[in-house]
Regions:
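PLP-dependent aminotransferase class I/II
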Residues: 35, 204-288
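Conserved PLP-binding catalytic core of the aspartate aminotransferase-like
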Residues: 270, 279-313, 329
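Active-site pre-lysine segment of PLP-dependent enzymes
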Residues: 114, 132-141, 154-177, 181-212
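Phosphate-binding glycine-rich loop
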Residues: 50-98
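PLP-dependent enzyme catalytic core of the Aspartate aminotransferase-like
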Residues: 162, 309-313, 317-318, 322-352
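PLP-dependent aminotransferase-like
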Residues: 91-148
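N-terminal "arm"/small-domain region of PLP-dependent enzymes with the aminotransferase-like
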Residues: 1-51
């Protein structure tokens, strides 16, 4: 049986895992759960699930467009950011083409590019940050897209508005810059980029957002892209019909209106990242300053060798060997009770 070698050579996605009895804090899910308004909207919509969903997602696109002060034709809703990445690669990548990104970042950029036979050219992080200058050096005549995850997954680090703009000015305007802002809702740094402003100045910019994190809808698989209408239209042509289910659409629309859930999530994340950052530092444990809903910290040994022990004590975190960071862990910021339990577990480690 002849199968495509580019598919056979791909590595399977490694998700965050857990075990029975442990609290799962390995996948950056919202510790408060889904928006109550979203749950109510899903319950109300259940009697209509025998009908096909709105294949254009026009209601949701219009509401997202209102938040961004853009027309709906600048918005594409899809079955999570993963599908958006595949649609992006579908319209840009052929065998012989390449994309540029960071090595220690979200693996689905690599997956989407290789799925269509392209080459992923990667630059290692520089002090935990995207090496933007180094990434520019990887561009050649076959480069179609550059991926920037800001804040970065799994480090939680970010490039500032000035740094990102300097980078965008150097990127040839025929190369798409895909700015993944899955965690941008959590960013509170004063110099964090305003991507809406950047869209006006850089027509080759595409922004990715998700409902999985701050809105707590990871199980419904829904995300969106913001870009020039011509680009959005091309991606829409590559999408499967009815790719976003009706429950995801109504939940997302309701979640957008739930300011109480959003504000509560932000309060928890901002309070607990400060608490945990200070406590890890007291213990001599290095962690990156985070602008996301997780914190990335380092131990003296490979996390894979102690993951089961930590999970057995009650916390399932993410070991980062698949990211090329075997001695680092990514921990979703949970409640104070969960975070204190993590610290207790770390205190009990024979060596850190």
């Amino acid at each position: 049986m002849n199968m495509k070698p580019n598919i056979l050579s791909m590595e399977a996605y490694v998700p965050g895992r857990t075990i029975e009895g442990a609290t799962k804090l390995s996948s950056n899910e919202n510790p408060l759960g889904p928006s109550p308004l979203a749950m109510a909207a899903v319950k109300k919509a259940l009697p209509e699930i025998h009908r096909y969903p709105d294949g254009t997602c026009i209601g949701l696109r219009a509401e997202i467009g209102g938040l961004w002060e853009l027309d709906a034709d600048s918005i594409l809703v899809a079955n999570g950011s993963d599908e958006l990445l595949i649609l992006l690669a579908a319209i840009l990548i052929d065998p012989g083409c390449n994309a540029v990104g960071a090595r220690q970042t979200f693996s689905q950029y690599r997956y989407a590019v290789r799925l269509f036979g392209g080459e992923m050219r990667e630059k290692s992080l520089l002090s935990g940050l995207h090496d933007l200058s180094g990434m520019l050096e990887l561009i050649n005549s076959d480069t179609k897209v550059i991926f920037v995850c800001n804040p970065n997954n799994p480090t939680g680090t970010y490039r500032s508005s000035q740094e990102l703009e300097s980078f965008l000015r150097e990127v040839p305007n025929n190369i798409v810059v895909a700015l993944d802002e899955a965690y941008a809702d959590f960013a509170d740094a004063g110099d964090f980029p305003n991507s809406r402003t950047l869209l006006t100045e850089y027509p080759n910019l595409l922004i990715l957002r998700t409902f999985s994190k701050i809105y707590g809808l990871a199980g419904l698989r829904i995300g969106y892209a913001v870009a020039q209408p011509e680009f959005i239209g091309a991606m829409a042509k590559a999408a499967m019909p009815f790719n976003v289910n009706s429950l995801a659409q109504v939940a997302a629309r309701a979640a957008l209106t739930d300011t109480g859930h959003r504000e509560g999530t932000l309060r928890l994340v901002h309070t607990e990242k400060e608490f945990l950052g200070v406590e890890l530092s007291k213990r001599g444990i290095f962690s990156y300053p985070t602008q996301a809903n997780f914190i990335c910290f380092a131990l003296e040994q490979k996390i894979s060798g102690i993951w089961e022990w930590i999970a057995g004590k009650g916390i399932a975190l993410r070991e980062l060997s698949s990211f090329g960071l075997p001695k680092m862990a990514r921990y979703t910021l949970g409640s104070r009770v969960h975070n204190q339990l993590l610290l207790k577990i770390l205190d009990e480690l024979p060596t850190r």
